[in-house]
């Protein structure tokens, strides 16, 4: 009986620890390298993410198409899509790079937990980032909420933690729902 009790204790979440912390940490492992597409791809592969082909996941393909359509003939884009099972849910990681004809570039690193029904509590996100956000965007309960840190963990990029309710009009319009983590960097100007 003492062994069983010890195992149960070992499996419990530490009091005060966020149930979303593994997702937040998985995001930081890859997206801390947001200034380099190659570094993000390598970090994703090294940390157990599985790359998948364009078109293999309709929700991801829809987001990728929206991005390509926005770029049009104005520049080029490249990237990779990954997935990973974590805490019983499938997460999707998209790493991208865009460059326009003038040399302006942007890199992005995003994790989508499309099925999340509740946002990451502000206190958990603040604890994970180590400080309060520099901005909060909250256009309404039906649309969602975004916490923003500028800079992110250090100078040179931003970090966002968002939640889009399953009933949001953004789900119908863009395919967005659940928890979305974003890191972005820009340059070339």
Q: What is each of the regions a protein language model found here?
A:
Residues 14-24, 41, 55-95:
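Accessory recognition modules or surfaces
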Residues 26-55, 179-185:
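Short N-terminal secondary-structure initiator segments
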């Amino acid at each position: 009986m003492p062994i069983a009790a010890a195992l149960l204790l070992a499996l419990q979440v530490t009091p005060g620890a966020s149930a979303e912390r593994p997702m937040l940490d998985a995001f930081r492992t890859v997206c801390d390298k947001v200034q380099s597409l190659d570094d993000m791809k390598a970090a994703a592969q090294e940390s157990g993410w599985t790359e998948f082909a364009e078109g293999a996941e309709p929700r991801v393909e829809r987001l990728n198409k929206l991005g390509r359509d926005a770029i049009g003939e104005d520049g080029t884009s490249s990237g990779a899509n990954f997935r990973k099972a974590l805490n019983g849910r499938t997460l999707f990681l998209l790493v991208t790079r865009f460059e326009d004809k003038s040399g302006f570039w942007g890199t992005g690193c995003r994790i989508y937990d499309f099925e999340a029904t509740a946002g990451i509590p502000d206190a958990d996100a603040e604890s994970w980032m180590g400080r309060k956000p520099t901005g909060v965007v909250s256009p309404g309960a039906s649309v969602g909420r975004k916490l923003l840190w500028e800079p992110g963990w250090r100078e040179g990029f931003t970090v966002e933690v968002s939640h889009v309710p399953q009933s949001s009009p953004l789900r119908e319009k863009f395919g967005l729902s659940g928890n979305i983590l974003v890191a972005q960097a820009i340059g070339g100007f």
